[in-house]
Design a protein with these regions (language model features):
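Residues that define the loop-to-transmembrane-helix transition and helix capping
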Residues: 9, 50, 86-89, 167
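Alpha-helical transmembrane segments of multi-pass membrane proteins
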Residues: 16-33
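Alpha-helical transmembrane segments of multipass membrane proteins
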Residues: 18, 22, 98-103, 204-205
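Extracytosolic (periplasmic/ER-lumenal) interhelical loops and adjacent juxtamembrane/interface segments
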Residues: 31-57, 116, 124
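Transmembrane helix-loop-helix
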Residues: 52-149, 184-200
Length: 260
């Protein structure tokens, strides 16, 4: 654990502590932390402003948190080392918030489609009980970034004995999540998983990576010559400014001592 980069280490610690504390609070005091901190529909009485942030630190069961934290450990640690703690934390949180936003949009569409079939009371009751928890949205964003930055890295999927490139795995996951989400929307395959939130994490991760690229941020391993030229010019310019500043100070000191 000590060898892990800073943000990855604290994300793992925070998620596991919150998971076990929420279980203790529910069993011993009857406090449902998932109902308080989980993401609810924005127009329901159960919604609170902190939920788009807190929901990504809550998990339904042990397998839920283990799979998410395994991905944080495998892929997040690499991004944490490559980007640095500050940039990686920003990316993780943005992906989680983006996943929450997409999930809210999906709920809005679902509830509007129910208007022709159900009465207002039934819709309000259904909206009140809509809840999403888990770091999966942020994790899918992390997976997307790994495939974006290290596309040719060989990876293995369970029950498939051959290595698959990271970019291919990201595409496969995105397609599976899209079809599963559409199945939930149409009622052909309901599995109580926020598939569109996963896609939302990927989408907002992609948008953030594009924003960083357009603002002259370079991915690890890039050999873009123009970036290197600009960096070299910036270094020479800063060095020239430091030399000019030193000369001015020496000149002022010389005339000061001369007057004395």
């Amino acid at each position: 654990m000590r060898n892990l980069p800073t943000v990855t280490r604290y994300l793992l610690i925070a998620n596991f502590i919150i998971f076990f504390l929420s279980g203790i609070l529910e069993r011993n005091f009857g406090i449902d932390v998932n109902a308080i901190g989980g993401l609810h529909y924005y127009n329901a009485h159960s919604f609170h402003w902190w939920q788009p942030f807190t929901y990504m630190f809550l998990h339904a069961n042990l397998s839920h948190i283990l799979f998410n934290m395994l991905a944080v450990w495998m892929f997040g640690a690499t991004l944490d080392n490559a980007w640095g703690s500050r940039r990686y934390l920003i990316y993780y949180i943005v992906c989680g918030l983006g996943a929450a936003f997409i999930q809210e949009c999906v709920w809005s569409v679902m509830l509007s489609n129910m208007a022709d079939t159900y009465d207002a009371f039934s819709i309000a009751h259904y909206a009140y009980n809509l809840t999403t928890i888990g770091a999966s949205g942020a994790v899918f964003g992390v997976l997307f970034a790994f495939g974006w930055l290290f596309p040719d890295t060989p990876m293995f999927i369970l029950f498939i004995p051959i290595p698959i490139r990271a970019r291919t795995i990201v595409i496969i996951y995105a397609i599976v999540e899209l079809f599963a989400g559409m199945g939930n929307m149409m009622g052909t395959h309901i599995d109580n998983v926020a598939h569109f939130a996963h896609l939302g994490g990927m989408l907002f991760g992609w948008l953030l990576l594009l924003y960083w690229r357009r603002n002259n941020w370079r991915e690890p391993g890039s050999s873009e010559w123009w970036w290197k030229v600009k960096q070299k010019c910036r270094e020479l310019f800063n060095r020239h400014q430091r030399l000019d500043s030193t000369k001015e100070k020496d000149y002022d000191n010389y005339h000061y001592h001369k007057r004395l």
